[in-house]
Regions:
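ASCE RecA-like P-loop NTPase motor cores
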Residues: 7-560
Length: 560
């Protein structure tokens, strides 16, 4: 605990990270990638595993000092990339989450992921978010256009004048609900000249105190104690959802007119879809009666005529990195196919109108949005097919590998270290702190392996030398051309948990999964209680205050 609180601890770790990033400057492939970034060209790189890819991306971001977007196949891959980048960059880049479309009307809808997305979209648009990690699905989902977002937000500034009636009306149009006490995001309360509001742009609710029409004072407050915690000069009140009916070019009235046109068109058909007509007319009544439309996503194409995704918020100056290009294409195809399978039930049940079903862009369309940026495609193996809109101008190959863990076997690790030393490699072993380094140094000495403590690390190890330095990585790395090996304390000192005696299992003819990695989106699976469904992917959900990973299975006639 003392070490974690010491600024010197962070300085030592930062110096180790800087050494790791500078190591790549000795590779001609790295210099070629840096030149391609400066020229805004597309380049493909093969032979890079997960940790190697993150090493390259971190070094390129640090040296180019440009904003960056890292695109991964799904949320789990994005979370792994996020953790690796945090180890190299010293700070955790935000992750843009995917979200489920709300196409069925419901009494209450959780918009936690939408709030997080709205904050990040605004951060991208204003340049506050410099590095972003996103899954293919999160990036390709249709969303509020950038210009519309800025037109729908409210900015509060101390000293400025506001008409409270007009201000609260704007909040209602932005999707906020009026309550007596503000407890969650998307709520506001007005008591005399005091306005409490909880915007997705902030971690805490805001209390704005007015003297007449002038905003006299403003600050955050604790929703539990209702006490002010920090003063503010300016605050941004973002729309509370990605699809807000009032953000239609002609407001809610314009959306009602569009829905009425769809109803009239259906009634003129020989075989009108009565279920769809009922849905449309019911939503028109809600809009005209001022009732919140929780399933506004189904009218996204009407509310936002311009097809826009999170990619449109990314700066034209940003460096774009596509991770596992082949998997990205497969993930995009699986998402489109999965949604296509659900469309039949949406159309038959009258949930969606046939002309309003465009919610995702393809991988090729997404890549085409970055023509001005250029891009770098990272793959373990060379891919034969790249997006036509953004093909690589050059293909590079890197010789490097990710090192496996030793399963707690120090003897195996010692053999590898001796092999590296014998072959003239410089070995850098990352420890969790100086005390841990001293312990590891003693353990290696018992195995006749000489190692030097480097706290702080000011240089890379020389040929045949082992340095123990501060730092941590999810996995080790080997660069044969540079003759460097980077190992982690976790590889060397992990202890395996004692094995439990397996209970005898009943005989079954079912084929059970050894790992969920055996599944690919679109596979048919049999749930023990719910029957046959289609595997969609892994999804994180917050249950009882804890965030856990869950398997998502789609069934006919329902979302999941």
């Amino acid at each position: 605990i003392t070490a974690l609180c010491c600024p010197h601890f962070y300085l030592q770790r930062r110096e180790t990270v800087n050494i790791l990033l500078s190591m790549l400057k000795k590779l001609p492939e790295y210099e070629a990638l840096l030149s391609a970034l400066e020229a805004r060209q597309a380049v493909a790189v093969s032979g890079v595993s997960q940790i190697i890819r993150s090493h390259f991306i971190s070094a390129l971001i640090a040296e180019s000092e440009r904003p960056a977007l890292i695109v991964c196949q799904d949320d789990l891959a994005a979370q792994r990339a996020q953790a690796e980048l945090a180890a190299f960059l010293g700070s955790t880049p935000p992750l843009l989450p995917a979200r489920e479309l709300t196409l069925y009307e419901s009494a209450s809808v959780s918009r936690e992921w939408e709030h997080r997305r709205m904050r990040l979209l605004y951060g991208l648009a204003t340049g506050k978010v410099k590095v972003l990690v996103a899954s293919m699905e999160a990036l390709s989902l249709r969303t509020v256009p950038r210009q519309t977002l800025f037109g729908g937000l409210v900015t509060l500034k101390c000293g400025a004048e506001y008409d409270l009636d007009s201000l609260t009306a704007r909040l209602v149009r932005a999707g906020y609900s009026r309550t007596s006490l503000v407890e969650g995001v998307g709520q506001f309360a007005l008591r005399g000249g005091i306005l409490d509001v909880f915007s997705p742009a902030h971690d805490q609710p805001i209390r704005a105190e007015f003297f007449g029409d002038e905003l006299d004072a403003m600050g955050f407050f604790d929703p539990l104690t209702q006490r002010r915690t920090e003063n503010l000069d300016e605050a941004v009140l973002l729309p509370v959802a990605e699809t807000v009916p009032f953000l239609h070019p002609d407001g809610a009235e314009g959306l009602c007119k569009d829905l009425s046109t769809l109803v009239a068109r259906q009634k003129r058909r020989k075989t009108p879809n009565t279920a769809l007509i009922s849905t449309l007319e019911g939503d028109i009544d809600k809009l005209q009666g001022g009732v919140p439309l929780t399933a506004a996503d189904r009218y996204m194409a009407l509310i936002y005529p311009e097809f826009s995704t999170a990619a449109d918020y990314v700066s034209r100056d940003a460096a774009v990195f596509f991770c596992d290009h082949g998997n990205l294409r497969r993930a995009s195809k699986a998402r489109m196919e999965d949604f296509g399978l659900s469309l039949d039930s949406y159309l038959q049940s009258g949930t969606l109108a046939g002309e309003l079903c465009e919610f995702y862009c393809t991988y090729d369309e997404l890549a085409g949005r970055f023509r001005e940026n250029g891009a770098i495609y990272f793959d373990s193996f060379l891919s034969a097919q790249f997006p036509e809109e953004l093909p690589p101008k050059r293909i590079l190959s890197v010789t490097a590998k990710q090192l496996p863990g030793y399963g707690g076997s120090l003897e195996t690790a010692v053999q590898d270290l001796k092999h590296y030393v014998k072959n003239g490699f410089g070995c850098l072993v990352l420890c969790g702190g100086k005390r841990r380094g001293e312990i590891l140094k003693g353990m290696l000495a018992e195995q006749s392996v000489d190692a030097l403590l480097a706290f702080p690390a000011t240089r890379l190890p020389q040929a045949g030398q082992i340095l123990l330095a501060d730092g941590s990585l999810p996995a080790g790395m080997e660069y044969p051309e540079l003759k460097y090996a980077i190992l982690t304390e976790g590889q060397l000192m992990t202890r395996t948990a004692p094995k439990k005696t397996a209970r005898p299992k009943k005989a079954t003819n079912r084929k059970k999964l050894d790992s969920f990695t055996d599944l690919t989106p679109g596979d048919l699976v049999v749930h023990e209680h719910h029957g046959i469904g289609r595997y969609v992917g892994m999804e994180q959900m917050k249950v009882d205050g804890a965030v856990k990973d869950y398997v998502k299975i789609a069934y006919q006639g329902s979302d999941a």
